[in-house]
Amino acid sequence: MDEKYTAKNRDKTFVVIEKRFKKNIIHRFSAKRSLFLFTPRNPIRRLAVCIATNVCFDYFLMFTIMINCVFLAMPDISEFAEYIFLGIYTMEMAIKLVAGGFFIDKYTYLRDAWNCLDFTVIMISYITLLLQTINDKVISDITGLRTFRVLRALRTLSIIPGLKTMVNALLRALRMLISVLILILFCLWIFSQAGVQLFGGALRHKCVLQIHGSPAFGKTYDEFYAEHIENSDNWLAKGNGEYVLCGNATGAGPCPTNYTCLPDIGENPNYGYTNFDSIGWSMLISFQLLTQDYWEDVYNKVIRAHSPWTVIYFIVINFFGSLYLMNLMLAVVATAYELEVKNTGKKLQQTAATAREQSLKEQERRNTLTVSEADSHVDDRNCTCCEQCCGCCYNPWLRVQSFAHCIITDSFTEVFIIFIIVLNTVFLAMEHHGMSMELKNVLKVANYVFTTVFVLEAILKLLAFNKQYFKSGWNICDLVVVVASLIDLGVEGLKGVSVFRSFRLLRVFHLAQSWTTMRLLLCIILNTLGSLGYLTIILIIVIYIFAVTGLQLFHTEYTPDKFRGEPVPRWNFNDFLHSFMMVFRILCGEWIEPMYDCMRACNGLCFLIFIPVTVFGKTLFFLFIGLVLGAFGSDTVEQEVEVSSFALPGPESKPCSVRERGISATDDNVKDDGQDEVQQNSEETKIDLRNNDKQSKDGMILENNCNNDSLASLGSLGSIPDIMDGSSVEDDISSCQQKDIQPCLPLFISSRFKCLREFDDTSHGKKWNNFRRQLMMVCENKYFETGVLVIIFASSILLAFEDIYLNEKPRLKLAIFYLDITFCLLFFLEMVLKLVALGFVHYYTHFWTILDFTIVIITVISLAASGLGMEQITAFRSLRTLRALRPLRAVSRWQGMKIIVNALMLSIPSIFNVLLVCVVFWLIFAIMGVQLFAGKFYKCVNETNMRIPPTEVANKIECYNKNYTWVNSNVNFDNVGGAFLALFQVATFEGWMEIMADAVDVTEVDEQPKFEATVYYYFYFVLFIIFGSFFVLNLVIGVIIDKFSFLKKKYDGTYLDMFLTPTQQNYYNTLKKLGTKKPQKTVKRPKNKCQAVVYDLVMSNQFEIFITTIIITNMIFMAFEHYNQSEVVTEVLATANIAFTILYAVEAIIKIIGLRIHYLRNLWNVFDFLVVTLSVMDAFLNDIFGDGIFMNPSLLRVARMFRIGRIIRLIKWAKGMRKLLFALVISLPALFNIGALLMLVMFIYTIIGMSSFGQIKLSGALNDQVNFQTFGKTFLLLVRLATSAGWNDILGPLLIQPPNCDPNYITTSTGEKIKVVNGDCGMPWLAISYMVSYIIIVFMIVFNMYIAVILENFNQAHAQEEVGITEDDLDMFYGVWEQYDPLATQFIKHEQLSDFIQDLDPPLKVKKPNNVAIATFDLPIVKGGHIHCLDILLALVKFALGGNLEETEAFKRVRTQMEARFDEIFPTREKSEIRTSTLQMRREEMAARTLQRAWKRRKIMRSFPSPEMIRYFIISAPETAV
């Protein structure tokens, strides 16, 4: 018995201690009567307690739940089985009720949340049975209640050890998401309202055939016209049956001849679901845009129906919504989970990093031996009984072992094995569809040879290492591959056993034994899988629950009659497999299209599945990815991993050293001297992927060289690189700002000729050098650089005019030609000037100047070719295309962008290293895909490209016999190259639905595909998505983010903070915030009585609450606005808008009256005034030009958008949202530079795309609006492709080849045919290179740079909040400061300091008595006895952080940088004359008091000659407080 908390609540409890897995598990129960019947010692209750705490009971329940989950996955569940499961769960509940009680006392049944879940599910089951018993007809109506049975799967979370703690921590961590979710909903509302105002009804515009003829007898013309436009046969439709959208605004999609664009025709696109007609549908579309799922469809439709300017709306949603909000959610989830795990004190926080490090170190420690140790312990590899059994044969056997040992551990053998592995991989990759018989035989013989080599290697290893062979995981993996290869050879001629061929692909993993990066990556993946085991189980359970829920709700709804005669969609809920794949697809981010199909079948119920799966699934997915990125982050990739003995021996390696691949040593085999040797070798062979780049002065890569200059190996902070002194990286010109100019010629030239060596000393040489110095001054002049930058921009803009219509505009073409010549001459002149000023050595050894030289030469050659009429020659066309690189010259002259580019370029080696490993991983899936699908994606289609059913055409021969076409899919697995392209589409989730559809329909080569003939091939893609995309692709992204963040710090001047201690870093991060705020003047209460009353009103909390209520009410009214609303609704909303506008205007007026000129000091007030002004203008414009006759209706819609700005005012009262938005605000400078880089890259690709693909025939996804024909259309297309949206659809038409195009001629807009190279056909190699490189550079690299900056600032803001000094604390400081310094002089008197720091709120508050603290602050006191606010704040921050700041060199340099920055921000502080300090004054005060006491004693001694009287007086006299 245990009396717990008896002093507080007298709750008596008892505990049962159970031994489980060698641990004592404590179960606590209430000691009161359970169910008011059973005492703790009652036999029945004791039996119940015994059963409830028994591990076998948990196992039985777990087994029951598993079986129940299997039954739940069946569409038709046996009622008898349901009764059995319900009985078991009821029995469990009864046992727990008897053992612990119901709910009154602590530790009873319902006091546990998991038991509440069990109780709820059981009660719902009984209610379902009761309703079914009462009336069998209501069975269909209680399907929703029966669906709750799937929640039983959650019971596994409370049964499986460890999962319960994981889920509890996860639920507590989700609390931090509240602010993010509110911000997302807030922004979603704003985007939705903007969508209603801008695009309401726009997607109903259609091209209608013009009326010909007259109405029939008895019909009016209006009736005839109405019937004509309502007849869908008169609407212009595409080949897929979708109607063509159009618009009447400038730049919108036009209608062809004989068609007219009319509004409000038919329903909206996608079965009426894609529209902005009301706030509900607009919220759905905005959520689709936020998640970037098939958003290119909405993008294309809106631009076509409205105007190209709507791209601004989509850019804002993509950059702010998708890139910031969604990734902020990722950061918050990962951070919150990490914090909760730390708070629980569990070991879960070590699973993502510590486990990997310990595993690698342990493996390295166990698996490395020196030669002497191996020789001395060679006998230990054999069993102890071998010598006794073998007798005289034992010594010869040892010699054979030693011989095999020397062979297998020889460096030549290792190189040979590596060569064989690489060669084997190449031969595996050579397999493709349509191979010749000779190549098949070569590959077959090669497989025999490779298998023989690997078998011999395994035999030699077994001979050499005996029992030690099986102590290495790599050796076991090798043996499995060898055995599988032998089985593959044995069953080579049989069908259906090709699975053994897949094991040959595992030979690629041999490379991991010699390739350190790949080996490290494999170890990371294996350890991460283990550490994320519980989370993976939770993810599977969530998928299972939603899959079963969808199965129970919708499995009878997907019928052909619901889809207007179309076949049932491939993605449905008809069985558990399809439901599982549907939920998996939603988790991968594809939810909108299957939800459209679901809504066609079941209407609104689909929201119950798709939205929760998307939101909750995204949360879990973000947590999963966050932990993966944590495991794959820099701390792992840059781990100082000792290069194992797999690698080639170094200079000190011995030829017969035992390698880990050959032998695993035990701890006893390693001697101390061997350990020292291993440790020494490891120190010499450490690798670091962060700092392996030798760089030039301007930050560009010259070569890669793995060395020991690793940041992680710096033992102290004593030697810090001098490259960063608070400034950025020097550009090419400023790096030469020296007293002496650079040599003009290389040393090997000038040293050979005496005249050149002595030239500088001659009078001509001095004149020449002076001339070069003058040129240097010209080149370094800021006006010269500005002029060059302007010329670069002007010449780049000129490239935008060279579209396919340029030949139809001869004057413009001639003007562009002459301008090109002018710019070319200017660039050539600049090049000559810099070449003379900098010298040949410097000019041709720096990246940016070499780039300038290359672009100038390309321009000269291109112009020469144009002048000679040879521009159509392929070589010159390619050079002309390279002129698109011209904007890159601006990078070296834009310092902010140059920092970004330098950081990016220096990240390339590490990115390439990891990317190469990822390619090897993908190679395995690519080769497997070739083996599974090569030649099987062919199909028989008709003239409309529709696949013929297999019942009509069975194979290729029948297809040709019936005059159909036998075609292959554009993306296929016929060879490894095509497989890589297909896998890239799957990894980016673009076009993967079509690829999977082709894969699961395959039968055999040259046979017609059949619908889901091999449905189990879905799992091939599931495995690739998990390992190839979730793991491997996110590893690349993680390296990009980490490397960019590190190098950006290095080059923007914040590099030194990496050398600071945690306390110093917190102090430094706080200092960076201090410069953002200054004291403000206090708004005094007016003396005029009327103004004073108004002032009191506007400053009261009740007034703010009233205004907030008005704003929320206004937003509710705005939500009722929709397209085609009734006149009554229109009038009510118009009246309400006028009323709200008047209220806002009155608010602004009374605030101006009360606050006077101080009203404009607050930016929120300025924003309010702007919104009020625009709202008043909107009301007047709507009243005067409501019919739109004198004003474009689009302008009215834009004016109405400003009403949405009223809701933004709520942010100033939302503390959580302000913090999240603050992280964005402080990121803006870096984001601006990244955005500029993004625009630069997009501009370059726009010029290249316009030049290379502008003449391609329009087909497929390319149409009159989406194409590469003009700069504007190309740029709009690349904005969409920046998010990888539908890039596969664009790639398809770019691959067009004859006979679908003309390889010799193009057709102009006038119908004229012009002969050009390649005609209107595509160039597949160029199209694939262009598209894939653009996706990699923009989507995977530049976008992740954007994310890296935001996440870094969020993590910094969160870490600063954990420290305790936040923006609100600084606001509080200056708020109190205003009371002591109403005129904002930035100074207060020394006498006020004690009261001031007493009035502050924690953590900056220092309670009285605080005189000692003030003295220790050592604050400078200027003339007049004043102290500056910044000095006080710096001291308080240091005091709040603990005050223990070690004065290291790095910290001193950082503080010097910040002091220089503060001097710029607070000039009055710098100019003030310091007279003393608080510490000095304290010392002077103490000295004065000491003198006073001494003088007092002296006077006493003189007044009282008796010693007793003196002693009595001193003791009895009161002491002055010190």
Swiss-Prot record:
<dbReference type="GO" id="GO:0005248">
    <property type="term" value="F:voltage-gated sodium channel activity"/>
</dbReference>
<feature type="topological domain" description="Extracellular">
    <location>
        <begin position="869"/>
        <end position="874"/>
    </location>
</feature>
<feature type="transmembrane region" description="Helical; Name=S2 of repeat IV">
    <location>
        <begin position="1133"/>
        <end position="1154"/>
    </location>
</feature>
<feature type="topological domain" description="Extracellular">
    <location>
        <begin position="1294"/>
        <end position="1323"/>
    </location>
</feature>
<keyword id="KW-1015">Disulfide bond</keyword>
<keyword id="KW-0472">Membrane</keyword>
<feature type="transmembrane region" description="Helical; Voltage-sensor; Name=S4 of repeat II">
    <location>
        <begin position="499"/>
        <end position="522"/>
    </location>
</feature>
<keyword id="KW-1003">Cell membrane</keyword>
<dbReference type="InterPro" id="IPR001696">
    <property type="entry name" value="Na_channel_asu"/>
</dbReference>
<feature type="topological domain" description="Cytoplasmic">
    <location>
        <begin position="1155"/>
        <end position="1162"/>
    </location>
</feature>
<feature type="topological domain" description="Extracellular">
    <location>
        <begin position="938"/>
        <end position="976"/>
    </location>
</feature>
<feature type="transmembrane region" description="Helical; Name=S1 of repeat IV">
    <location>
        <begin position="1101"/>
        <end position="1120"/>
    </location>
</feature>
<feature type="intramembrane region" description="Pore-forming">
    <location>
        <begin position="1271"/>
        <end position="1293"/>
    </location>
</feature>
<feature type="repeat" description="III">
    <location>
        <begin position="770"/>
        <end position="1074"/>
    </location>
</feature>
<dbReference type="InterPro" id="IPR044564">
    <property type="entry name" value="Na_chnl_inactivation_gate"/>
</dbReference>
<dbReference type="Pfam" id="PF00520">
    <property type="entry name" value="Ion_trans"/>
</dbReference>
<keyword id="KW-1133">Transmembrane helix</keyword>
<feature type="transmembrane region" description="Helical; Voltage-sensor; Name=S4 of repeat IV">
    <location>
        <begin position="1195"/>
        <end position="1218"/>
    </location>
</feature>
<keyword id="KW-0677">Repeat</keyword>
<feature type="intramembrane region" description="Pore-forming">
    <location>
        <begin position="576"/>
        <end position="596"/>
    </location>
</feature>
<feature type="transmembrane region" description="Helical; Name=S5 of repeat IV">
    <location>
        <begin position="1237"/>
        <end position="1258"/>
    </location>
</feature>
<feature type="topological domain" description="Cytoplasmic">
    <location>
        <begin position="332"/>
        <end position="406"/>
    </location>
</feature>
<feature type="glycosylation site" description="N-linked (GlcNAc...) asparagine">
    <location>
        <position position="258"/>
    </location>
</feature>
<feature type="transmembrane region" description="Helical; Name=S6 of repeat II">
    <location>
        <begin position="608"/>
        <end position="628"/>
    </location>
</feature>
<feature type="topological domain" description="Extracellular">
    <location>
        <begin position="202"/>
        <end position="278"/>
    </location>
</feature>
<feature type="topological domain" description="Cytoplasmic">
    <location>
        <begin position="899"/>
        <end position="915"/>
    </location>
</feature>
<feature type="transmembrane region" description="Helical; Voltage-sensor; Name=S4 of repeat III">
    <location>
        <begin position="875"/>
        <end position="898"/>
    </location>
</feature>
<feature type="topological domain" description="Extracellular">
    <location>
        <begin position="554"/>
        <end position="575"/>
    </location>
</feature>
<feature type="glycosylation site" description="N-linked (GlcNAc...) asparagine">
    <location>
        <position position="963"/>
    </location>
</feature>
<feature type="glycosylation site" description="N-linked (GlcNAc...) asparagine">
    <location>
        <position position="1124"/>
    </location>
</feature>
<feature type="topological domain" description="Extracellular">
    <location>
        <begin position="1259"/>
        <end position="1270"/>
    </location>
</feature>
<feature type="topological domain" description="Extracellular">
    <location>
        <begin position="304"/>
        <end position="308"/>
    </location>
</feature>
<feature type="topological domain" description="Cytoplasmic">
    <location>
        <begin position="465"/>
        <end position="472"/>
    </location>
</feature>
<feature type="topological domain" description="Cytoplasmic">
    <location>
        <begin position="100"/>
        <end position="112"/>
    </location>
</feature>
<feature type="topological domain" description="Cytoplasmic">
    <location>
        <begin position="838"/>
        <end position="846"/>
    </location>
</feature>
<feature type="topological domain" description="Extracellular">
    <location>
        <begin position="999"/>
        <end position="1009"/>
    </location>
</feature>
<keyword id="KW-0813">Transport</keyword>
<keyword id="KW-0851">Voltage-gated channel</keyword>
<feature type="transmembrane region" description="Helical; Name=S3 of repeat III">
    <location>
        <begin position="847"/>
        <end position="868"/>
    </location>
</feature>
<feature type="transmembrane region" description="Helical; Name=S2 of repeat II">
    <location>
        <begin position="443"/>
        <end position="464"/>
    </location>
</feature>
<dbReference type="InterPro" id="IPR043203">
    <property type="entry name" value="VGCC_Ca_Na"/>
</dbReference>
<keyword id="KW-0739">Sodium transport</keyword>
